[in-house]
Design a protein with these regions (language model features):
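Histidine-centered, transition-metal-coordinating active-site segments
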Residues: 2-82, 96, 100-348
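Short alpha-helical catalytic segment bearing the HExxH-like zincin motif
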Residues: 83-91
């Protein structure tokens, strides 16, 4: 009998998933337990940053956990199989170290460089295509979650994807909240028509929405602060060098696990560089480029949410939330970021 991923998860994840959807849709298990989806359980949502002491997090929340959680949120609010599956599949093309590959592809700002592979991966999966045929669902109804506004929409609106990674990062990865607060936030959400007459998630209560903005504004800075930008670019540059030296193919990044690539790095000439980063406690910054030192100087995707409270953006009705959003958006990314011991020549 085939293993069931949902039976293997720990109690913290079970409790979280149960908040998102108390009545788990059993039909979803067949899709979760396909080879292509199960591969995602070995990829961290932290884009590899979890492997460095620069970050405090020890909770491994996988790309698969995120996909399941997004699917549960969509199912909770829509009870629509096609939309739910589009959410489950939205990161099926996620490679090792997640968005680090976008940094390899020089896609710092949109971080969408891998999404073109989604259709191809689903189409080439005999398991998934058989299930879709069984359920009378067309590939083009589930391979693009941008089609469904509850699944995904444009910043600064609230969608299932944006909501999920905010909740799980706050709860598990960066410990900015606890399970009771997550439950309070989630249970305050409803679906309304936004200013464009399109369905969007909204809060019922201004106070809860303000708490959510406080959390997401802090997270948004974490996603692009010095240690994060440095870590993602360093890992991307190491992988790029491994690729140039034929030690790792681009295909490997979609087939291997995070730990497999780490093992390859440890057996390469980049071992010392990786271990300096792995054991580092704090990055250094400079307004000018440090001489002969490997440094990172780039912007990154700005993730922020200005949610609706009933039918109005919170920034229009709450000065505290407006200031939190403005502070988040004004975060300075002009500095050069570096670590002692890693030279420019090492990665050029």
């Amino acid at each position: 009998m085939k293993n069931n991923y949902m039976e293997s998860i720990n109690k913290d994840l079970k409790e979280y998933f149960n908040i998102l959807e108390p009545e788990f849709p059993i039909w979803l298990n067949d899709y979760i337990n396909t080879k292509e989806m199960l591969k995602q359980q070995y990829i961290s949502m932290t884009c590899g940053t979890i492997y460095s002491d620069l970050f405090e997090s020890e909770f491994f929340f996988s790309s698969l956990d995120h996909a399941i959680a997004v699917a549960l949120i969509i199912w909770h609010f829509t009870k629509d199989k096609k939309q739910t599956l589009s959410g489950l599949f939205h990161d099926i093309a996620t490679p090792v170290f997640k968005h680090c590959v976008d940094f390899m592809n020089k896609d710092y700002i949109t971080q969408e460089s891998t999404e073109d592979l989604t259709t191809q991966i689903i189409e080439n999966s005999e398991e998934i295509m058989t299930l879709l045929q069984r359920d009378k669902i067309q590939l083009n109804e589930v391979d693009n979650y941008h089609l469904y506004p509850i699944a995904d929409n444009d910043t600064p609106q609230l969608s299932s994807d944006r909501l999920e990674y905010s909740l799980s990062n706050a709860l598990f990865t960066y410990k900015l909240s606890d399970i009771e607060k997550i439950k309070e936030i989630y249970n305050d959400i409803k679906i309304v028509k936004n200013e464009h007459n399109i369905d969007e998630m909204a809060f019922k209560n201004k106070k809860i929405a303000r708490e959510f903005v406080k959390i997401t504004s802090r997270l948004s800075v974490i996603y692009r602060e010095e240690r994060t930008r440095y870590s993602m670019q360093l890992l991307a540059d190491i992988m790029k060098k491994l690729n140039e030296e034929n030690l790792v193919t681009l295909e490997d990044l979609y087939k291997l696990k995070d730990k497999d690539i780490i093992e390859i790095i440890r057996n390469s000439k980049y071992k010392n560089i990786y271990e300096i980063w792995e054991k580092a406690k704090k990055v250094k910054v400079s307004p000018s480029k440090p001489k002969d030192i490997y440094s990172v100087h780039l912007s990154a995707k700005v993730r922020y949410i200005d949610p609706l409270v009933n039918n109005e953006r919170i920034s229009k009705i709450c000065k505290i939330a407006q200031k939190q959003i403005e502070k988040n958006l004004s975060y300075n990314m002009d500095n050069y970021v570096f670590l002692d011991g890693i030279k420019e020549i090492d990665l050029t």
